[in-house]
């Protein structure tokens, strides 16, 4: 765990997304949860050591952001889209995932349920706790339900998976125009610290590089379509323009992810 600012703590070493919390005078606000129950128990203890856990925020609908929310106290906040998506996820599917990736965590799974948000919002909302403002706002593009979390008093923003800092970007469900618009929104914030969905903490200057990766993927697929390649040909022939490796411990092989990205973009632009 890293103490990033006076009241902001971040964990970048658990599977799979980055985690954080703000320790306010009136309690703790947590951002995202680990995938492994064994990690969740440790992370819960870290946060509870700084105060009562009052709120938990899941920044999108992919399981690396919400899978262990069941193990955390506090009022849960997500976007409407994320809550709607999670209503469709059976607890049995999560149990099978845990058996595979965290065998020691199976003992924690008795009574497990996929936790749904207590509060949702459509576009943005502000939470006031102690001396802190927690501003939540929609950040679609990587996923339908993505949201950002901005803490102006700490000059920090959690970007969900709109930013992969020097990790391979997952565009397998992307809407690139929305992704680029979300990056522009992030660039306009007064933030000194950028907490990406994956990778190490960075500054706002990385947003330009992230936008370039999205744009290069789109250009590569549009070029293949213009040449008359079939989707199968595009999947086989397009080399990834992303210079960074896939994060270890995440699903799919790198070739499988490349094909999934090409297929998604081909369907959008063909």
Please describe what each predicted stretch is:
Residues 1-45, 148-160:
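Conserved beta-strand hairpin/beta-sheet module of binuclear metal-dependent hydrolase folds
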Residues 7, 22, 32, 47, ...:
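Divalent metal-coordination and catalytic microenvironments
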Residues 18-20, 119, 123-125, 147:
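Residue-level detector of beta-strand structural context in well-folded domains
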Residues 28, 35-36, 87-217:
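Metallo-beta-lactamase
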Residues 37-82, 190:
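Active-site metal-binding motif and surrounding structural segment of the metallo-beta-lactamase
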Residues 42-44, 68-71, 89-91, 171, ...:
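Short amphipathic alpha-helical segments
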Residues 188-190, 201-270:
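Accessory terminal helices/loops
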């Amino acid at each position: 765990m890293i103490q990033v600012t006076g009241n902001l703590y971040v964990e970048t070493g658990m599977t799979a997304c980055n985690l954080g919390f703000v320790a306010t005078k009136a309690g703790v606000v947590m951002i995202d949860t680990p995938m492994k129950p064994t990690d969740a128990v440790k992370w819960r203890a870290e946060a509870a050591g700084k105060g009562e856990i009052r709120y938990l925020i899941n920044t999108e609908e992919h399981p690396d952001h919400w899978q262990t929310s069941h193990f955390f106290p506090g009022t849960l906040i997500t976007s409407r889209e994320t809550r709607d998506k999670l209503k469709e996820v059976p607890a049995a599917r999560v149990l099978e995932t845990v058996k595979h990736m965290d065998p020691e965590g199976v003992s924690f799974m008795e009574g497990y349920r996929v936790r749904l948000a207590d509060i949702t919002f459509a576009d943005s909302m502000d939470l006031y706790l102690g001396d802190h403002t927690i501003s939540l706002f929609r950040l679609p593009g990587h996923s339908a339900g993505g949201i950002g979390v901005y803490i102006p008093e700490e000059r920090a923003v959690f970007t969900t998976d709109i930013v992969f800092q020097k990790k391979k970007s997952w565009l397998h469900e992307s809407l690139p125009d929305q992704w680029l618009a979300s990056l522009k929104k992030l660039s306009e914030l007064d933030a000194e610290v950028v907490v990406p969905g994956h990778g190490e903490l960075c500054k706002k200057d990385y947003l330009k590089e992230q936008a370039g990766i999205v744009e290069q993927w789109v250009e590569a697929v549009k070029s293949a379509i213009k040449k008359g390649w079939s989707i199968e040909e595009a999947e086989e022939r397009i080399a990834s323009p992303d210079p960074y490796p896939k994060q270890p411990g995440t699903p799919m092989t790198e070739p499988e992810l490349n094909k999934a990205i090409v297929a998604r973009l081909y369907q959008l632009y063909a």
